[in-house]
């Protein structure tokens, strides 16, 4: 039947979907590779005096902090850690939407398959009582296949939920480490300002 062929096709595609979402859930390895590749030509192009550049940048940073204290906030907002956090939160949101879509798909498959099983059992048995019709509908091979499909979808939903929870835990860990890093950075900036204002 067309319904059974459709269920078999979906069943074959299910592992590919799980692998695809697992690949999306992993942190961006391609960004790290691109950064690693970009570091090479940058190193070869830097032939000027690095000591003078570092001193000039330090003086500019201290003067900018004295003039405009909002620069540190804008730099923090554009930091790569902030970008990674936003990317991981987007990934966790997409995983949760996939979990919801799989749940609704499970419900629709169960409902339509149950209707099909009841219709087939009523067509084969004819006029019988509702209790006997329910028992015969549960014993059909279509009902058995529907149970197997439902179990596979339930396992997929469970795996996707675990992936979403891992992503959320990873995102919270990164936020904590980012907060500690920014606090340490602000302390070092305060020390630089104090050194710049001291007469010694």
UniProtKB/Swiss-Prot annotation:
<dbReference type="GO" id="GO:0001669">
    <property type="term" value="C:acrosomal vesicle"/>
</dbReference>
<feature type="compositionally biased region" description="Basic residues">
    <location>
        <begin position="167"/>
        <end position="183"/>
    </location>
</feature>
<dbReference type="Pfam" id="PF15775">
    <property type="entry name" value="DUF4703"/>
</dbReference>
<dbReference type="GO" id="GO:0007286">
    <property type="term" value="P:spermatid development"/>
</dbReference>
<comment type="function">
    <text>May play an important role in acrosome formation and nucleus shaping during spermiogenesis.</text>
</comment>
<keyword id="KW-0597">Phosphoprotein</keyword>
<protein>
    <recommendedName>
        <fullName>Sperm acrosome developmental regulator</fullName>
    </recommendedName>
</protein>
<keyword id="KW-0968">Cytoplasmic vesicle</keyword>
<feature type="modified residue" description="Phosphoserine">
    <location>
        <position position="63"/>
    </location>
</feature>
<dbReference type="InterPro" id="IPR031534">
    <property type="entry name" value="SPACDR"/>
</dbReference>
<feature type="compositionally biased region" description="Basic and acidic residues">
    <location>
        <begin position="184"/>
        <end position="200"/>
    </location>
</feature>
<feature type="region of interest" description="Disordered">
    <location>
        <begin position="167"/>
        <end position="200"/>
    </location>
</feature>
<keyword id="KW-0221">Differentiation</keyword>
<keyword id="KW-0744">Spermatogenesis</keyword>
């Amino acid at each position: 039947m067309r319904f059974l062929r459709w269920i078999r096709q979906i069943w074959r595609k299910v592992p590919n979907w799980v692998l695809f979402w697992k690949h999306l859930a992993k942190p961006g390895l391609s960004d790290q590779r691109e950064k690693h590749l970009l570091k090479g030509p940058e190193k070869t192009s830097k032939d000027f005096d690095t000591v003078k550049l570092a001193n000039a940048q330090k003086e500019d940073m201290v003067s900018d902090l004295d003039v405009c204290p909002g620069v540190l906030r804008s730099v923090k907002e554009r930091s790569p850690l902030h970008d990674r956090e936003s990317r991981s939160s987007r990934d966790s949101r997409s995983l949760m939407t996939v979990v919801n879509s799989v749940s609704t798909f499970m419900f629709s498959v169960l409902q339509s398959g149950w209707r099909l099983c009841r219709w087939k059992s009523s067509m084969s048995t004819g006029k019988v009582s509702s209790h006997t019709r329910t028992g015969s509908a549960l014993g059909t091979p279509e009902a058995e296949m529907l149970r197997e499909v439902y179990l596979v979808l339930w396992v997929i939903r469970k795996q996707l939920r675990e992936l979403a929870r891992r992503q959320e835990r990873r995102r919270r860990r990164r936020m904590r480490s980012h907060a500690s890093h920014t606090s340490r950075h602000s302390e070092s900036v305060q020390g630089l300002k104090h050194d710049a204002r001291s007469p010694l």
